[in-house]
């Protein structure tokens, strides 16, 4: 079973990815991890990718597809794979298709932008311990102060509202065409099965919807 999992930053994609990989015994594959592993192993593709990255270039889709083919040939991918952060663009989705790498499921965890902004911009972190609070959902006893040490809490740059909104706009610009691409493919070929899963509610509720979509 080959699954593409889509979801905006803060939509809870990581939690569901963990569930899917454990439930179905398939690895989560990200292009970043694959690139790092190939460069470290000094494979032919890894060396090509390294020379491109060292010169400040972007690794081509053809090279990424080559890495994916190599990765899918490994024994732990025998039952399938969960793609994380790939494809991001229509050319990448077309390259997957042209390489004969069929996808069985495309899941999108969908959460309203304002809900994501609320989730992420309210996060506060205690730098020393990594403890995470939230101004609304999990506030510290004293505003802006870590419960244990009494030290100040920080807001990560990634969680600043302006940054969150920018990341969301990038996500939508990339993902909307992808969802349309796979929906048309499903209408034409009956595959992949495309599912739009509301990402609001308890983790258990969302997981149940994911499981139903994959069954």
Swiss-Prot record:
The record's keywords, sorted A to Z, are: ATP-binding, Cytoplasm, Kinase, Nucleotide biosynthesis, Nucleotide-binding, Transferase
Q: In which pathway does it act?
A: Purine metabolism; AMP biosynthesis via salvage pathway; AMP from ADP: step 1/1
Specify where the region named LID lies, as residue ranges: 122-159
Task: Provide the residue positions that the database annotates as binding AMP.
Answer: 31, 36, 57-59, 85-88, 92, 156, 167
Q: Where in the cell is it found?
A: Cytoplasm
Q: Origin, by domain of life?
A: Bacteria
Provide the Gene Ontology terms for cellular component: cytoplasm
Q: Which GO terms describe its biological process?
A: AMP salvage
Q: Outline the segment boundaries, as ranges, of region: NMP.
A: 30-59
What remark about domains does the record contain? Answer: Consists of three domains, a large central CORE domain and two small peripheral domains, NMPbind and LID, which undergo movements during catalysis. The LID domain closes over the site of phosphoryl transfer upon ATP binding. Assembling and dissambling the active center during each catalytic cycle provides an effective means to prevent ATP hydrolysis.
Q: Mind telling me which HAMAP family this protein's record contains? A: Adenylate_kinase_Adk
Protein name as annotated: Adenylate kinase
- Origin organism is Pseudomonas syringae pv. syringae (strain B728a)
């Amino acid at each position: 079973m080959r699954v593409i999992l889509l979801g905006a930053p803060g939509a809870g994609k990581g939690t569901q990815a963990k569930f899917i990989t454990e439930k179905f015994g398939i690895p989560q594959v990200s292009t970043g991890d694959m690139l790092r592993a190939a460069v470290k192993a000094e494979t032919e593709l890894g060396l090509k990718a390294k020379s491109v990255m060292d010169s400040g270039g972007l690794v081509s889709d053809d090279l990424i597809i080559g890495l994916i083919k190599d990765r899918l040939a490994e024994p732990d991918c025998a039952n399938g794979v969960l793609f994380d952060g790939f494809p991001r663009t229509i050319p990448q989705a077309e390259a997957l298709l042209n390489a004969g790498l069929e996808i069985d499921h495309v899941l999108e965890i969908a959460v309203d932008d304002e809900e994501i902004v609320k989730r992420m911009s309210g996060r506060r972190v205690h730098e020393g311990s990594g403890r995470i609070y939230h101004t609304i959902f999990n506030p510290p006893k004293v505003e802006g102060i870590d419960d244990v040490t009494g030290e100040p809490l920080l807001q990560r740059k990634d969680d600043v509202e302006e940054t969150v909104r920018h990341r969301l706009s990038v996500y939508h610009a990339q993902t909307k065409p992808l969802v349309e691409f796979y929906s048309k493919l499903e209408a034409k070929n009956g595959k992949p099965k495309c599912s739009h899963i509301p990402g609001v509610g308890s983790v258990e509720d969302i997981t149940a919807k994911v499981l139903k979509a994959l069954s």
